Amino acid sequence: MIIPIRCFTCGKEISSKWEPYQELLKIDKGKAEALDELGMRRICCRRMFLGHVDIVDKLLKFDIVKDFTQRS
């Protein structure tokens, strides 16, 4: 899904660091090293990135509106 705007535990804003994090991973940085470089020191904020599963592209494959119009 879409990365949350704030950390669920401490409330720190984390969404602005998602894209730089993805870019660092693309240039073969380790996950821990990328988070350190972005200044994410708190365990709660780090787990928000490490536990995130990006499934938006998979969800967009299902078009509910199309199914309803075909049944009518």
UniProtKB/Swiss-Prot annotation:
Disulfide bonds: none annotated. It comes from Encephalitozoon cuniculi (strain GB-M1) (Microsporidian parasite). Component of the RNA polymerase I (Pol I), RNA polymerase II (Pol II) and RNA polymerase III (Pol III) complexes consisting of 14, 12 and 17 subunits, respectively. It comes from the Eukaryota. One of its GO terms (biological process) is tRNA transcription by RNA polymerase III. InterPro entries: RNA_pol_su_RPB10, RNA_pol_suN_Zn-BS, RPABC5/Rpb10. Gene3D superfamilies: Homeodomain-like. Its main location: nucleus. This is DNA-directed RNA polymerases I, II, and III subunit RPABC5. GO terms for cellular component: RNA polymerase I complex; RNA polymerase II, core complex; RNA polymerase III complex. Zn(2+) binds at residues 7, 10, 44-45. GO terms for molecular function: DNA binding; DNA-directed RNA polymerase activity; zinc ion binding. DNA-dependent RNA polymerase catalyzes the transcription of DNA into RNA using the four ribonucleoside triphosphates as substrates. Common component of RNA polymerases I, II and III which synthesize ribosomal RNA precursors, mRNA precursors and many functional non-coding RNAs, and a small RNAs, such as 5S rRNA and tRNAs, respectively. Pol II is the central component of the basal RNA polymerase II transcription machinery. Pols are composed of mobile elements that move relative to each other. In Pol II, RBP10 is part of the core element with the central large cleft. It is found in: Nucleus. The lineage of its organism: Eukaryota, Fungi, Fungi incertae sedis, Microsporidia, Unikaryonidae. Belongs to the archaeal Rpo10/eukaryotic RPB10 RNA polymerase subunit family.
